């Protein structure tokens, strides 16, 4: 995106939801909390360029272990965005630059 950092969400809320979608400057992104870490990706499957979630803020599989594309069931590693199963295997989600402070997750726009 850019290099101006904006506040996206408070950390406690994201920890509760596990994943959450946002729209910033007409760009759809989503954040995921896993194992004490925060990851932010563009909400776009590399296969067809469509949104990933099947319901608002539902980006993870039933075990909250992988990001899933609702259209063709492609599975992505949360930590890397790498597609490990499905029609885009070997491709990856676009990582959005982010940082955390004591209370909030910030993203670069």
Regions found by a protein language model. Give the residues of each.
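Zn-dependent metallo-beta-lactamase
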Residues: 1-23
